[in-house]
Each structure stands twice: as C-alpha cells, then as structure tokens.
C-alpha cells in the first residue's frame, strides 16, 4: 500500500490546520469537558483526560488553553451535557465510514451527517453495518526529521509495547493496542518526541482502493463532515490513488 494512500488524511490535515485551528480547538475542548465530567480534572487519575490532552498537544493546542478548558469543565456544574454517538454508513463506491459526534442535539447531528453522506452518493446505515470492519487501536504519528533515526525509533516503540511500526512518505506511524497506547505514548514523550497525531482511533482491517473520481467525491464528503462542529472523528477504509491531490 502506498504511503500517500494510507496516510493521506494526515498529510492533507497538515496544510489545513492553520485555517481550521479554532474549530479543532473547540472540538477538543468538548472532549475535555466530557473527560472531566466522567473522571475528574486530574490527568494523573483520569486516563481519558490524559488521552485527550495528548491529542490536544499533537494538534498544537497551547498548554494554557488546555488548562483553561480543564478548569472551565470542572467548574461548570450546569455545563451542557454532550451525548456521544457513532454513525455508520457508506460513502461513494461503498467506502465504509464511521462518524463520531459529541452533540447536545442528536436530531441536528443526525440530519447533518445524513446530508453529508447522501450529497456525495453515500448513505447512512444501521448500527453495526460497518463497525465490524474496524478495530480500536492507538496511533502515534511522528514527522520525519533530520537526526531522527528510524531504527532507533522503531526499537524504542516496539520495546515500549507497540504492535507495529511503519515508515510512510513523510511520517513514521506507530500502532498500539488500545490498552498499551498510554504506556507507549508516554515512553516516546519521555524521549522528547513530538507527535502529529496521538490518539485512539478506529483502524480498518483492510483498505479499499478508490479511483480519482471517487476520491474527489469522498474528499468533499469528508470536508463537510469535518467542518461540522458536532463531528469529532471520521474513520474510513478508503485507499486514495497514488499521487492524488484534492
């Protein structure tokens, strides 16, 4: 599988982050609210909060912004209650898609997600229609830089408990079990490494190759979903064409 195909979304996001940084921070802030409500404001005793903080740092969210979000969440006893929902369905050409939302209005979210699917020739499905094609895994993505030795990094990751290590185009990708994600992430952080991504994700068992026409339609669908304030994550099994650019 080509590096561009598998890691297309990561590479594409790098160019969009500045334009959408405020929206990304808002979404992560919602995740912090949910994590604090579930397990309290201390990252030491709240694994979910630790994971969200790692995601925030990978997205260059400033530490003071993270801390303000935690304090705000812990102080708002009457804060908005967000509901976590995962929608499943098919994009153009039958691409399997999972959409995670955090919402205070599930009717609004359902309508918006359904519109994004149908606009590009896809459709929402019933619960379980595609989730069996994915596994929950930890993924840590590190940008290739001068002075970062691939073999040393691989041994570091595997010794810490990683399941897999890949070198793809401009990045190294470390995959872990959901259970070992925190341990591996902390081991790499202790070595001074910075991450492009560090989070628990739904990873497809296999990828489906799509042509350029389908890739263009699907990217439009992804853009609509990712622009929705309620949508936190979008996972899919599409393998984009080699050399394709939106």
From Swiss-Prot:
Main location (coarse class): cytoplasm
Highest taxon in the source lineage: Bacteria
Pfam (any one): Transcrip_reg
GO cellular component term of the entry, any: cytosol
Gene Ontology BP annotations: regulation of DNA-templated transcription
InterPro entries: Integrase-like_N, TACO1_YebC-like_2nd/3rd_dom, TACO1_YebC_N, Transcrip_reg_TACO1-like, Transcrip_reg_TACO1-like_dom3, YebC-like
Localization of this protein: Cytoplasm
SUPFAM superfamilies in the record: YebC-like (SSF75625)
This protein's UniProt keywords: Cytoplasm, DNA-binding, Transcription, Transcription regulation
Gene Ontology molecular function: any one: DNA binding
Coiled coil: none
Membership in a protein family: Belongs to the TACO1 family.
NCBIfam families reported for this sequence: PRK00110.1 (NF001030), PRK12378.1 (NF009044), YebC/PmpR family DNA-binding transcriptional regulator (TIGR01033)
Full protein name: Probable transcriptional regulatory protein CLM_3478
Organism ancestry: Bacteria, Bacillati, Bacillota, Clostridia, Eubacteriales
């Amino acid at each position: 599988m080509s590096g561009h195909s598998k890691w297309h979304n990561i590479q594409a996001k790098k160019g969009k982050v500045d334009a959408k940084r405020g929206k990304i921070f808002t979404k992560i802030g919602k995740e912090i609210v949910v994590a604090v409500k579930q397990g309290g404001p201390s990252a030491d005793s709240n694994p979910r909060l630790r994971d969200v903080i790692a995601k925030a740092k990978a997205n260059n969210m400033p530490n003071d912004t993270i801390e303000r979000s935690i304090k705000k969440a812990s102080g708002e006893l009457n804060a908005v209650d967000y509901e976590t929902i995962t929608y499943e369905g098919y994009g153009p050409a039958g691409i399997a898609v999972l959409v995670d939302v955090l919402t205070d209005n599930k009717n609004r979210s359902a309508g918006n997600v359904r519109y994004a699917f149908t606009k590009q020739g896809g459709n929402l499905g019933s619960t379980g229609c595609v989730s069996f094609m994915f596994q929950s895994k930890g993924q840590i993505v590190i940008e290739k830089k001068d002075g970062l030795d691939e073999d040393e990094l691989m041994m570091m990751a595997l010794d810490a408990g990683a399941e897999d290590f890949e070198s793809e185009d401009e990045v190294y990708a470390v995959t872990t079990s959901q259970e070992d994600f925190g341990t591996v992430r902390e081991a790499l952080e202790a070595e001074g490494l910075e991450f492009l991504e560090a989070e628990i994700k739904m990873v497809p068992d296999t990828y489906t190759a799509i042509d350029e026409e389908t890739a263009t339609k699907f990217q439009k669908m992804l853009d609509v979903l990712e622009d929705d304030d309620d949508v936190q994550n979008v996972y899919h099994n599409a393998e984009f064409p080699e050399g394709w650019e939106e």
